[in-house]
Curated annotation (Swiss-Prot):
Biased composition (Basic and acidic residues): 62-71
Family under the similarity heading: Belongs to the WUS homeobox family.
Gene Ontology MF term list: DNA binding; DNA-binding transcription factor activity
GO CC annotations, alphabetized: nucleus
Composition bias, Low complexity: 144-156, 177-195
Residue ranges of the region described as Disordered: 23-76, 130-156, 176-195
Gene: WOX12
SUPFAM superfamilies: Homeodomain-like (SSF46689)
Organism in which the protein naturally occurs: Oryza sativa subsp. japonica
Biased segments, Polar residues type: 23-32, 44-57
Official protein name in the record: WUSCHEL-related homeobox 12
Amino acid sequence: MASPNRHWPSMFRSNLACNIQQQQQPDMNGNGSSSSSFLLSPPTAATTGNGKPSLLSSGCEEGTRNPEPKPRWNPRPEQIRILEGIFNSGMVNPPRDEIRRIRLQLQEYGQVGDANVFYWFQNRKSRTKNKLRAAGHHHHHGRAAALPRASAPPSTNIVLPSAAAAAPLTPPRRHLLAATSSSSSSSDRSSGSSKSVKPAAAALLTSAAIDLFSPAPAPTTQLPACQLYYHSHPTPLARDDQLITSPESSSLLLQWPASQYMPATELGGVLGSSSHTQTPAAITTHPSTISPSVLLGLCNEALGQHQQETMDDMMITCSNPSKVFDHHSMDDMSCTDAVSAVNRDDEKARLGLLHYGIGVTAAANPAPHHHHHHHHLASPVHDAVSAADASTAAMILPFTTTAAATPSNVVATSSALADQLQGLLDAGLLQGGAAPPPPSATVVAVSRDDETMCTKTTSYSFPATMHLNVKMFGEAAVLVRYSGEPVLVDDSGVTVEPLQQGATYYVLVSEEAVH
């Protein structure tokens, strides 16, 4: 090991020489020892033979000219605060240049020397190390006392080997950082370099994070006592009353077993099922408070998109009429009249004059009333409007009416309408107890006047589950699909298959039936 006083300032050498000379002066004067006179020059000889002052005499004179502080130095509170701040910042073993700067900073509050600063840092490190050792010893005894009661199972006893029992336990995490800094400072004492402990602290935090997220191994007899204690005590779970933040969420959290976490998929399923199961209760709360007129408006509003699609189909058909009416050679069909007719029917539907209950009532009349020439087959519509007051509630509210008060065909379609309720409710078309609109099909009646070469069209909306009587448009009327394929009818003129939902049909009517 190098000399411990190699970095000491020069004042210690001068003071040591003066002390030795003062102790040897009585022997020189009293006994006249030759050895004393040989080692030390007499006090009267201030210079050597060549006229230069001796080392010891010059040191004493320097000590008398520049008085140094006493060996026992009592720092002031201001100086202690400065030193503590420097020590806590990470400089636990300052070099010689830093000691001089610190001494100049401390001299503003009182006389201090370089040696005082050096020894203060050494004593401060020793006190820190002693505190850490005492704290680790205290926690070691506390864990050893709690180990047999906490980690051992009730039926078996864990016997630790001598090597594991003699192994030093890991100190608490709050003291681990300070212990690392003290050990690094003690290793740097001989070299005199100042190394910061921040890299060591960063490495410690990284290793601690890895230790926290690593899986816990199975407890065996080869593990230290502290690891057995930690692994046998999992993290306590929060109670149910701490997790529940609102009365609405209590039914969701209490029906699941307590666990450390719940996957996001399961949580989403719980919330989705809860909102789905609560929807029918809200819908069936007030089923009889909605009037038929309000439900009629909801039906028309929900089918606005379907009516727009019907208009698009009419536009396509008008642009290529020979594709549908190739059997009757209606090439002079006017697209403007077709679009205007659809627009008028759309306005009637929004005003409540044309809805899904009209077609069923009109189908019961085998002989419709025909108006004068140039009227566009409006008789089924007018007959249906006259009977709309009696059949609106039966078609819109199938669950609140009786079979005796409704026609037979209305009762037949009520069961089919009931099957569509749940699907429309789940689709979000209805809100708060409104009844869903029944499925419908669009029928467009097309007639052509051979004299004026003008084509007239009229659009109707019928329930999709009914069998349409084509003869209501005339004895020679023909029903075709939008692709031009004719629809099969029986001898009485009723379609063999019911109308398809959302489909568009065309009725080819001769002008004689209109007159």
